[in-house]
Amino acid sequence: MKKIMAYTFLTICGLLIIGACSSTDDDSSRSSTSMPDYETTTLSGKIAGVSWTFDTGRVVVPSSGSTYSYSLTSDNLSNACSSTYTGSSSHPKIIASRSEAPSVGEEELCFSSGCSKTLTFYDGSMNYIITTGKIKIDTVTTTEVTGKMYAKSGSDHEINGTFTLSRCCLSGSNYALCSE
């Protein structure tokens, strides 16, 4: 009787160990975290651990077939097109560049083979490359681009909300609001 109980006990322990170590085909354990919906308030959150709320931004239209440069800051700049976006520990900035003109639609951030759509958060001394997020452009006019953005990297970098960027074109030797 003791042998039967010992074998039963060992069998149960063995099954428990095998069950605990086995893998599952449940997709929910492997799926990536889905991104939240866009906030309907002004783009805000944390950059480099500092509270951040969007104030001024621009997209620079290249004078030739170069790249479109995007800059967003929490600084209240007097002129989105001609001001300097420096980025500092108290006012980090967001920068990005794309080879295509802004157009209505949505894109996910990525950094993998064949895909390099990223944002850079800059705090005056360090560039943080952000590869998780999404950007949705709602409207593009001669003078502005409106949209929504969600971007995250760890607990110190997360923003979500809406933005309006000035479209800036070269006018002589300076940039000014586009007037096509």
Place the predicted regions along the sequence by residue.
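Sec-dependent bacterial lipoprotein signal peptides
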Residues: 1-20
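Bacterial Sec-dependent N-terminal signal peptides
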Residues: 15-42, 173-174, 179-180
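Sequence contexts marking disulfide-bonded cysteines in secreted/extracellular proteins
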Residues: 22, 80-82, 109-116, 167-170, ...
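Short, hydrophobic/aromatic-rich segments at coil-to-beta transitions
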Residues: 38-39, 66-70, 141-148
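Surface-exposed helix/loop patches within compact recognition domains
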Residues: 58-139
